[in-house]
Amino acid sequence: MEALVYTFLLIGTLGIIFFAIFFREPPRLPVKGKK
């Protein structure tokens, strides 16, 4: 069960860092087909 907790914490940390960078620097990719 400990492995599950560590995996959850790891994914949570990576997710927070990813969203922090994403909202700080919006991607300059041309979005097509998005409503």
From Swiss-Prot:
Signal peptide: none
Membrane-spanning residues: 3-23
Function description: Found at the monomer-monomer interface of the photosystem II (PS II) dimer, plays a role in assembly and dimerization of PSII. PSII is a light-driven water plastoquinone oxidoreductase, using light energy to abstract electrons from H(2)O, generating a proton gradient subsequently used for ATP formation.
Description of how the protein assembles with itself and partners: PSII is composed of 1 copy each of membrane proteins PsbA, PsbB, PsbC, PsbD, PsbE, PsbF, PsbH, PsbI, PsbJ, PsbK, PsbL, PsbM, PsbT, PsbY, PsbZ, Psb30/Ycf12, at least 3 peripheral proteins of the oxygen-evolving complex and a large number of cofactors. It forms dimeric complexes.
Membrane topology designation: Single-pass membrane protein
GO biological process, one term: photosynthesis
Keyword Membrane: yes
Name assigned to this protein: Photosystem II reaction center protein T
InterPro entries on file: PSII_PsbT, PSII_PsbT_sf
Classification via Pfam families: PsbT
Cellular component terms (Gene Ontology): chloroplast thylakoid membrane; photosystem II reaction center
Family affiliation: Belongs to the PsbT family.
Keywords: Chloroplast, Membrane, Photosynthesis, Photosystem II, Plastid, Thylakoid, Transmembrane, Transmembrane helix
Compartments, as annotated in UniProt: Plastid, Chloroplast thylakoid membrane
Gene: psbT
